[in-house]
Amino acid sequence: SFRCGDPQLLTGPGGFPYFQLLLPESGTAFECYVLSHMVDDFLFERGWGVVINLKGNQPDWLLTYGDVVNYKLKKEFYSAPQISELPPTGVIQQDEQVLVGQPSDSLLPPQVRNAMRQYLEFHGHHGVKIALLTRMTSQGPVQQLIFDLAPEQFADEPTYQAFLQSLGWF
């Protein structure tokens, strides 16, 4: 059980929204917030992460929206990757077999698509397509979301790479 911080909603690194929670103070009455209930009640729907016990700029714990989504889908905030050997990003080898398709709603729920669309549009990228790429590795198939974004749409390669990295928040 947590109590709510003031303000309730903060803008964190990268401009992402976080709901602020604090440990309750001993002997002080408070409105109880239960994280597992909050996911279903509003966090998942609104596209918010959670910051816990923020002191200065240092939280005890930070849950991205992707962590919230993982909890909604799998009832755990973190799931270890099933395959540790990921293929090189961005390059499909000449003889590599891949499958490209539309991600299902169970893999990428409409609420997540909406939050990603809003983020992309906020940063000036309208109509971005998202696909699911399945690649074979020595450990079996691995699935990755891909976006029709190109380095030419950004000021330089580091800005492009940083933006792609920021999509990991979801």
Regions found by a protein language model. Name each.
Residues 1-170:
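An interfacial alpha-helical scaffold signature
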